[in-house]
């Protein structure tokens, strides 16, 4: 009995080491997911698709809707920080519009366009939450679906890049622009579409200049990403132990840092480059994911 009792501290140490190892592994996993989220949320290549495919490639499995939606909060912190001056001007414009009726003022019109553009994805998201309880496990989130959608969106972006007139600028935005791009944003609820990809494609089709299109799409995404993260926040934390909070925070912080870099890079890149690099990437991504699935190695 004494020998067994003397091994108590050893067992405690082993349990502590196992728990620490598990915590470090979870932090590493969420660090990688945060980097993937940050790189893909604002580039037109679909963060949802990459957050499903990358973990499966390394044997982690699908992290699920709740976890990825919460990690997306890091991206929203980044976009708010990056566009804080723009947001302040929009809020100021809206306040003046309500006070003096100056709805023709550019910042007021931009705020109105963002509000109108948020409604389609808000209503569609609520409908999925209420009437499609099996969405997370549905075939729409399967690898072949993601691959095909990625290829289709690549072709649409190619058409928009080729035939869009690229005349509109940010100061010309109207509520109608918000509605058109907002409808495209709602399509991002389909994994593989890409919120930034669908909105950028719609903006280019609608005649926006590339950099202003990207800027508007980023601002339009703020309410959508925020609401998605907050809706899933309660469910995600309900499933977590105390030790699970730290990995989630690691994911959020890494997503915020990388998202800021991605936003800054894309806006500068589109000043003098087209979106063809993303067309090629999405085609290759879709083809490779489809080939991976057909090979049977994804099971």
Swiss-Prot record:
Subcellular location: Cell inner membrane
Record keyword Transcription present: no
Family note: Belongs to the UppP family.
Additional comment: Bacitracin is thought to be involved in the inhibition of peptidoglycan synthesis by sequestering undecaprenyl diphosphate, thereby reducing the pool of lipid carrier available.
Membrane topology reported for the UniProt record: Multi-pass membrane protein
Gene Ontology cellular component list: plasma membrane
Signal sequence bounds: none
An annotated GO BP: regulation of cell shape
EC number(s) on file: 3.6.1.27
Function recorded in the entry: Catalyzes the dephosphorylation of undecaprenyl diphosphate (UPP). Confers resistance to bacitracin.
TM annotation in the entry: 10-32, 63-83, 112-132, 143-163, 178-198, 213-233, 243-263, 276-296
Pfam annotation, one family: BacA
Catalytic activity, as annotated: di-trans,octa-cis-undecaprenyl diphosphate + H2O = di-trans,octa-cis-undecaprenyl phosphate + phosphate + H(+)
HAMAP family according to UniProt: Undec_diphosphatase
Keywords: Antibiotic resistance, Cell inner membrane, Cell membrane, Cell shape, Cell wall biogenesis/degradation, Hydrolase, Membrane, Peptidoglycan synthesis, Transmembrane, Transmembrane helix
Any one GO MF annotation of this record: undecaprenyl-diphosphatase activity
Protein name according to UniProt: Undecaprenyl-diphosphatase
């Amino acid at each position: 009995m004494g020998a067994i009792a003397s091994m108590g501290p050893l067992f405690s140490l082993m349990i502590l080491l196992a728990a620490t190892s598990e915590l470090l592994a979870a932090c590493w996993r969420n660090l990688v997911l945060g980097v993937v989220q940050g790189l893909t949320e604002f580039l037109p290549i679909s963060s949802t698709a990459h957050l499903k495919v990358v973990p499966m490639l390394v044997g982690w499995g699908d992290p699920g809707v709740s976890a990825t939606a919460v990690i997306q909060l890091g991206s929203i912190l980044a976009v708010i920080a990056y566009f804080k001056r723009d947001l302040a001007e929009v809020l100021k414009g809206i306040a003046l519009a309500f006070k003096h009726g100056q709805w023709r003022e550019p910042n007021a019109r931009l705020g109105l366009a963002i509000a109108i553009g948020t409604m389609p994805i808000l209503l569609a998201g609520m409908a999925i939450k209420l009437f499609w309880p099996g969405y997370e496990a549905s075939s729409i989130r399967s690898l072949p679906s993601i691959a095909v959608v990625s290829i289709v969106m690549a072709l649409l972006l190619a058409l928009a890049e080729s035939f869009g007139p690229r005349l509109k600028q940010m100061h010309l935005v109207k509520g109608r622009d918000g509605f058109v791009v907002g409808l495209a944003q709602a399509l991002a609820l389909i994994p593989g579409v890409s919120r930034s990809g669908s909105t950028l494609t719609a903006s280019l089709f609608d005649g926006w200049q590339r950099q202003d299109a990207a800027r508007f799409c980023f601002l339009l995404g703020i309410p959508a990403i925020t609401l998605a993260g907050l809706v899933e926040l309660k469910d995600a934390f309900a499933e977590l132990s105390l030790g699970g909070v730290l990995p989630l925070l690691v994911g959020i912080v890494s997503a915020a840092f990388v998202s800021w870099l991605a936003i800054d890079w894309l806006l500068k890149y589109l000043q003098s480059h087209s979106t063809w690099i993303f067309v090629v990437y999405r085609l290759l991504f879709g083809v490779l994911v489809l080939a991976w699935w057909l090979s049977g190695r994804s099971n």
